[in-house]
Swiss-Prot record:
This is Holliday junction branch migration complex subunit RuvB. It comes from Clostridium botulinum (strain Eklund 17B / Type B). The keyword GTP-binding does not apply. Residues 1-181 are annotated as: Large ATPase domain (RuvB-L). Pfam families: AAA_lid_4 (PF17864), RuvB_C (PF05491), RuvB_N (PF05496).
Amino acid sequence: MERIVTPAEMFEDGNSELSLRPQKINEYIGQDKVKERLNIFIKAARNRKEALDHVLLYGPPGLGKTTLANIIAKEMTGDLKITSGPAIERAGDLAAILTTLKDYDVLFIDEIHRLNRSVEEILYPAMEDYALDIVIGKGAAAKSIRLDLPKFTLIGATTRIGMLTSPLRDRFGVLCAMEYYDETQLKEIVIRSAAVFGCKITEEGALEIASRSRGTPRIANRLLKRVRDYSEVKSNKVISLKEARDALELLEVDNQGFDKVDNKILEAIIDNFNGGPVGIETLSYFIGEELGTIEDVYEPYLLQKGFIVRTPRGRIASDKAYKHLGRVNNKNNNSNKGQTSFFK
């Protein structure tokens, strides 16, 4: 069963995300620095009747990269074609996509860091010269033919910018870091989404959902749908603070946006390992979750929020973790020191 607070896209998100997506850049909530830069670059490109420079969007999942790509395509009056790194297995697959593009179209490649090298090399002349180099024949008889491509924009999206090769990364003219949303921005998103869904919600109810959404619009919209279900069954015409809080408690999403496993990890470190340090393999065995799942799914948000600290000796629970669980930290260790980045 998938976690309701996962930032990754779930099957149920598909149709609702399409209906909730803003269509213009001025309708897009949050990411103000990214919006301002893109707005200027888009207007400049349109004035010169040129394609927008290739754009790389990087940051955690669920923050609106696909939505931004859709907006850019509309602002440039082009069509959006969506694919992903894992879906493009051979160079011929990418060549087939590139040859269907028209001027000002946008090609969006999600998880672009997962492109294999032979496919990636096809992109180099396509991005630099709007050209596609095709080799015909084999051996001594082989010859290369260059096909002209339309003036398109490539938008790459990645959650792991460090995994991109330098030649690919350097070919993007615009790099945009997507950041987590604050509660005020998420509250606006929840209120807007509620209007699209046709349900009424108070500002307090929207803020309660926003505060448990882990800084991620995708999670906020998913929680709103479940709170709406709860409110309708309880015959409440408006989602108030009480309805939102009761529904989220039923879903076992606490006031930090943590679910059962998040809290289980904190409890294990504090109650069973005296606050740490504890090795990730030991922790994995103790809570019954795969090591990779802890590192990729659960740990990043706990690190980002400062509830655990990663050190060379293992994971340590911070003072925030003790306070969150209502425990007293009697251990004389400085839990605020250590490696807090989950990108290393």
